[in-house]
């Protein structure tokens, strides 16, 4: 059994931040459970581009508001508490944040926790262990 709190993660190597977002990596690849689980906060009035070419991501919006844009179709979806989106086709997408968003995210395969988005918004391919 693994029990962690976001308070215990804050300020550690599991607390990863960039210009417009912060992600607390609660469950990671080294936990050996086949997925990773994160609490991610995106700053208000920001725009972030993502493209997870090597991962499937499920996102549950807990608080805030924004817009999700699918770059392939141009379709836009409101992001409000209670909204889930699943990037099961490795979609290139944009998150436009109106009010600070707090989201719970699951990645498969799991991330290690120190990945950095490249210029396209993607994480590198996972390395087999």
From Swiss-Prot:
<protein>
    <recommendedName>
        <fullName>L-ectoine synthase</fullName>
        <ecNumber>4.2.1.108</ecNumber>
    </recommendedName>
</protein>
<dbReference type="GO" id="GO:0019491">
    <property type="term" value="P:ectoine biosynthetic process"/>
</dbReference>
<comment type="function">
    <text>Catalyzes the circularization of gamma-N-acetyl-alpha,gamma-diaminobutyric acid (ADABA) to ectoine (1,4,5,6-tetrahydro-2-methyl-4-pyrimidine carboxylic acid), which is an excellent osmoprotectant.</text>
</comment>
<dbReference type="InterPro" id="IPR010462">
    <property type="entry name" value="Ectoine_synth"/>
</dbReference>
<dbReference type="InterPro" id="IPR014710">
    <property type="entry name" value="RmlC-like_jellyroll"/>
</dbReference>
<comment type="pathway">
    <text>Amine and polyamine biosynthesis; ectoine biosynthesis; L-ectoine from L-aspartate 4-semialdehyde: step 3/3.</text>
</comment>
<dbReference type="InterPro" id="IPR011051">
    <property type="entry name" value="RmlC_Cupin_sf"/>
</dbReference>
<dbReference type="GO" id="GO:0033990">
    <property type="term" value="F:ectoine synthase activity"/>
</dbReference>
<dbReference type="Pfam" id="PF06339">
    <property type="entry name" value="Ectoine_synth"/>
</dbReference>
<keyword id="KW-0456">Lyase</keyword>
<comment type="similarity">
    <text>Belongs to the ectoine synthase family.</text>
</comment>
